[in-house]
């Protein structure tokens, strides 16, 4: 029976790993050297393949290999019924199969090929990974005019083996007629760069942002054959933004080639004009912002201590107006409600911007592509994305900059209802709070609303169109009135000034906003995999305690409704299904028996890490290490997938046993 290509590749990989483990190649070299010395002394004799095989058989090496490479007869049957496992050595050395794509013959395409990497000196001492050995990998993510791509992972090395090609449609969406192909002049007016984001994934699955680069591709418009090669130097991020991390050799090719090319002088002139126009707009906005700030300080000198953030640095330490980080973002079919959008942002990982040495909170607001590809970011990254999504759903949303407990700087999102209702959204938890201001002039006997939110002070709010600074006598959130049209309470910036540097297409230097991508994770497969790993970890843990383990599959299944109810509550704020869950548990636990359950939530899929966290809870440790008569254990895992690689992982451990006291 012929194996499918993916199974044949996996089989080759397993055989290769087994041969490597047994060092068959080394044994063959030893036999070859010995045979040449002892049996083939004369120059006239030549060592044939048959002679070498005979020598290998005589030494028992062939028999040893065949004994090791044994395959069970029912393996094919098991593969049809169980979840297919990937090859243990996941780095595919075979040539990648070409994937068919729909190419519009009336459109122009840019084929970007990443040929290889050079001078990644941080990995100079790293050797090539052995087959089956886990290793850190590089992944390259691209975005160009609403198109996103991701390379296959390659092992981290001084010269990483990047070999990937990406077909980019040049005049996507609005530019160009449907029946007219973009010419060189039209393409020269497209100032969108190709954004490259390089990620590093370590052996535990943690991702690190290595570099974020904007590639200017329009030099190809001046080449005769529509082909050019570039050496793209990648710089680090944050405090290392001036340090080179490596070089990518890139080949650009236009399909179909241009009938008429442009001179390099014309291209350089266009790029120079764009830079000059951008610099002038940025200069004028800076002049205006300084004047606006002086006016704000004249209202009340104490305003100097309020958190009024006009500019923020991105991962490349480029200063940009905060309004440029916001733009209405529609999620298409990926998210259905604003609350689901808040849940999606909540399950993206939280990680403070890295810093070298001590000091205050580091400044780094990531571009949207870098945040989405890394799948984690700081509080500001979460807030910016949530605000973009809420604007996309038609809400009047703003990012708030202020402080929470102990004076710690913090950001959150605010929406203003048509009826004037103010709602705060915490991007890191998905919680929502209704704001009802306290009137400090009311007499003491008047009952005041008690705020439930953790926010203490607020300095400013902003969106993609507006920037307003808090000019009320007190900046405490609980007494603030959020009537943003009242200029006596909120000092606005000129919307025209903001538009000149923050609206789409206003500046060539503005990073374009990428679309969201659907999840590539299979929820059922991921749930099964994590659950199996947790069962093994529990088994090992109890074995160390000299305890036997008996699993109750039916009880495990009955935990599913509880996990579903928890996720629904996190998404909608409504609790449902708890009565049915409790009734089923009562029926499953006999009289005289005790039931204990422990649910916990994660935003990663690392089973060992999750298990270690669970054991730190005394209540969970009591369940996992439980002793008793007729003791049965249960565990249920449910993975809920969201756009990108985001997921909510719910785990519930439970046990039932008969009380003997």
UniProtKB/Swiss-Prot annotation:
GO terms for biological process: regulation of centriole replication. Disulfide bonds: none annotated. GO terms for cellular component: centriole; centrosome; cytoplasm. Keywords: Cytoplasm, Cytoskeleton. InterPro entries: CEP76, CEP76-C2, CEP76_C, CEP76_N, CEPT76/DRC7_peptidase-like_dom, Papain-like_cys_pep_sf. Its main location: cytoplasm. The keyword Manganese does not apply. It is found in: Cytoplasm, Cytoskeleton, Microtubule organizing center, Centrosome; Cytoplasm, Cytoskeleton, Microtubule organizing center, Centrosome, Centriole. Centrosomal protein involved in regulation of centriole duplication. Required to limit centriole duplication to once per cell cycle by preventing centriole reduplication. Belongs to the CEP76 family. This is Centrosomal protein of 76 kDa. The gene is cep76.
